A protein has these predicted regions:
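Signature of the chorismate-utilizing enzyme
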Residues: 1-210
């Protein structure tokens, strides 16, 4: 990483490719998901079109931008964090400006750098920022997921299902590449059990849902 540019985080990709005949997206994700605090697996639902027949895995988050409860929160690779004041009038224009300002803080170059973007989701509740639709806003003690969150990952793995190819892209240099390759070769995969605690409940009553 080079921060010679004021307020800009500059990275250059390190890339490696291999045949994916011995790997599956789920199998690779299970081997890599514990490398960082956040990881994602996004699989394509279209295996017939070569342009869309891809799956992506992101691990080792570097930065993120999230929208929740009228606030926009940004975190950066140097540990800095910004949180906007609560704004009941937060709209699509404000969010677009925040995303543009966030993206301008990063300069990523090198082979396959087009894959080093933001990965995340926009939830159904985010409709409140784009349309005149009221959404019940509740803060939960657990699993209080943002309405919108997108993350820049240090490491991206791209499965090209049409050509049976796996491309590994890292912003962590050769050391990052070696770490990923070592994790890929692990024979054992740690699994975690889960069970429900208590009875199912909903924040919306049957009448409200109707």
């Amino acid at each position: 990483m080079d921060n010679s540019k004021t307020n800009t985080f500059a990275y250059t990709t390190t890339v490696s490719s291999m045949l994916a005949d011995l790997h599956t997206p789920v199998g690779v994700y299970l081997r890599l998901r514990d490398l960082g605090a956040v990881s994602v697996l996004m699989e394509s639902s279209d295996y017939h079109d070569k342009d869309n027949s891809r799956s992506f895995i992101g691990v080792n988050p570097l930065a993120s931008i999230a929208v929740a409860h009228g606030r926009i929160e940004c975190s950066y690779p140097d540990g800095t964090r910004t949180v906007s004041s609560p704004d009941e009038q937060l709209d699509s224009s404000c969010i677009a400006d925040a995303f543009n300002a966030f993206l301008q803080r990063f300069d990523i170059t090198g082979e396959q750098s087009n894959h080093c973007g933001l990965y995340g989701y926009t939830s159904f509740n985010a409709v409140r920022y784009f349309e005149q639709i009221e959404v019940k806003d509740e803060t939960q003690s657990k699993n209080d997921a943002p309405d919108i969150v997108y993350t820049l990952f240090r490491d991206i793995l791209v499965f090209d299902h049409f050509n049976n190819k796996l491309t590994i892209i890292t912003l962590g240099g050769q050391a990052g590449m070696d770490e990923l390759r070592k994790a890929l070769m692990r024979q054992s995969v740690q699994t975690f059990g889960f069970k429900a605690v208590g009875s199912p409940s909903s924040t919306v009553s049957d009448e409200e849902f109707r």
